[in-house]
């Protein structure tokens, strides 16, 4: 299992270093029984571009995920670090907790879940090792 982390210039805004970030994601992937994912850490401007280009939605979002039908790559997650920082304040959640909840959401989509009770349960289980469920 592996995490391909891109967009390292944005990680300084998050409350963990690159190695901690990758270790957390690898633990989540292990639970989700996924092999390899790409994670792009981006700005609001960049995620707005991807949101328009791939989802045909105008504006900023916090996370996008793209499952792939590839034995070497389960999927990609695009995470707006700007949105994580802003929304964690807005929702009064610690930035670490909020970031991990968005990552669990993206991983759930890559694992094949759609919004609903089963996905919520899956995300809660992904977060249990971090005591965030």
UniProtKB/Swiss-Prot annotation:
Keywords assigned: Cytoplasm, Endonuclease, Hydrolase, Metal-binding, Nuclease, Ribosome biogenesis, rRNA processing, Zinc
Enzyme Commission (EC) number: 3.1.-.-
Record note on cofactor: Binds 1 zinc ion.
InterPro entries, A to Z: MetalPrtase_cat_dom_sf_prd (IPR023091), YbeY (IPR002036)
Principal subcellular localisation of the protein: cytoplasm
Enzyme class: hydrolase
Location within or outside the cell: Cytoplasm
Keyword Acetylation: no
Similarity-based family: Belongs to the endoribonuclease YbeY family.
Protein name stated in the entry: Endoribonuclease YbeY
Organism: Lawsonia intracellularis (strain PHE/MN1-00)
């Amino acid at each position: 299992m592996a995490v391909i982390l891109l967009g390292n210039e944005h990680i300084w805004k998050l409350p963990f270093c690159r190695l901690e970030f990758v270790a957390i994601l690898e633990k989540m992937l292990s639970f989700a029984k996924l092999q390899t994912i790409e994670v792009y850490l981006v700005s609001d401007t960049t995620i707005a571009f991807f949101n328009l280009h791939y989802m045909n939605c105008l504006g900023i979002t916090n996370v996008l995920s793209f499952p792939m039908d590839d034995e070497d790559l389960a999927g990609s997650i695009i995470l707006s670090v700007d949105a994580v920082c802003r929304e964690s304040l807005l929702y009064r959640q610690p930035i670490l907790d909020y970031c991990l909840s968005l990552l669990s959401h993206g991983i759930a989509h890559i694992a094949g879940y759609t919004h609903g009770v089963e996905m919520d349960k899956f995300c809660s289980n992904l977060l249990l090792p971090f005591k965030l469920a």
